[in-house]
Amino acid sequence: MVCVIFVAGHNDLLESEIASDVSGRFDKLKGVPKALLPAAASTDGTPSTILGRWWHLVNTRQILEVFLVTNANKFKYYERWATANDFPVENIINDGTTSAASRMGSVADLDLVLRAKPSICESDVMVVAGDMIFSNDFDISGVQRFFREKQGSPRKE
């Protein structure tokens, strides 16, 4: 199974809310992609960013490869994150968009990954919204098990 994590959102609403905060409490978050924002503190030592938690979760399971899809504005943020977190930089796909008005959408972003990395077309693909927070006890193996039980894809024996 391959995992594609979508982190291509342009965060317009969140960024405007952070920019309009006059207290200065959130200044360090200006421009930071939503998936790289701090997540709730974990008690088990997992990473503190939303994407870091997803990477830890899928990296410890039977996932062959993980890909990120991002936009041109946030690409450098994810490139730095990848370097610091042992994520293969070549698995970051830039959809080239620079604003919410030019965004491609999830289906087009998935198509972009499939065209850019044609070898994954032979694999089952799990798609994740990279800015979604999950509970500390979430176990992705349950998602994989459900997929197999429902025969989401014929298993090659």
Would you name each region that the model predicts?
Residues M1-Y77, S99-A100:
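N-terminal glycine-rich phosphate-binding loop and ensuing alpha1 helix
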Residues F75-E157:
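Conserved beta-loop-beta/alpha segment of the NTase-like Rossmann-fold superfamily
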